[in-house]
């Protein structure tokens, strides 16, 4: 099982703790064999659960250039049409340049793969983050925005990684100026929370995913490009 480089420090630390736990188990087995066996089994179980969270399975990215794939594993929780003038994020209002915005929200559980991927080829233009503070009890987030391109048609696209819990941490290795391929890994949300994908509401891109649908990053098709639709 391949483990993500985004969690290398965490799963290496877990492995060191496992080795220490097994050494303790060996000592316990010498004195109280059942207790030592139980401690060893518990150590292996905890280690297995921990490193499984950082798994990075191989994904075959679809070669159909007209398809946009899911940016994260999870459940499509909601879809919302946001009038540009009503959008709370100034960076999104500017990125979408007057166009209304369609937001697709994907929620993640601890059991999902947490590697985030690009839904289509994207040139990154903006990277903005906000940390949770005592004054603001809402979630921390990192927003990545840029220009998506499908069959020589360009359109604004944005991805927002959201961490709700105290243990959740956002990792984003993409930087302004990067040109990322469809399905390219660019980060993760450690211990999970929510991913939001933003697309122009009126565009050549048609949404085919449904709320309640389980999706897989880089694999499940969320939307398709059609030249019959006009921006």
PLM regions: where:
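Contiguous, well-folded functional domains in the mature portion of proteins
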Residues: 1-231
């Amino acid at each position: 099982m391949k483990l993500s480089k985004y969690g290398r420090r965490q799963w290496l630390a877990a492995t060191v703790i496992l080795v220490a736990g097994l050494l303790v188990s060996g000592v316990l087995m010498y004195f109280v064999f059942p207790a030592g066996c139980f401690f060893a089994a518990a150590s292996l179980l905890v280690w297995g659960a921990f490193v499984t969270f950082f798994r990075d399975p191989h994904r075959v990215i679809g070669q159909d250039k007209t398809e946009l794939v899911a940016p994260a594993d999870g459940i499509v929780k909601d879809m919302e049409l946001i009038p540009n003038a009503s959008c709370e994020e100034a960076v999104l209002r500017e990125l979408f340049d007057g166009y209304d915005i369609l937001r697709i929200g994907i929620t993640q559980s601890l059991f999902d793969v947490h590697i985030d991927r690009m839904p289509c080829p994207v040139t990154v233009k903006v990277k903005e983050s906000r940390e949770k503070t005592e004054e603001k009890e809402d979630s921390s987030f990192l927003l990545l925005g840029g220009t998506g391109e499908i069959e020589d048609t360009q359109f604004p696209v944005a991805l927002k990684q959201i961490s709700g819990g105290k243990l959740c941490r956002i990792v984003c290795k993409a930087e302004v100026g990067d040109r990322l391929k469809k399905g390219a890994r660019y980060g993760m949300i450690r211990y999970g929370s929510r991913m939001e994908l933003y697309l122009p509401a009126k565009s050549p891109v048609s949404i085919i995913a449904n709320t309640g649908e389980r999706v897989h990053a880089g694999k499940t098709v969320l939307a398709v490009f059609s030249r019959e639709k006009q921006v």
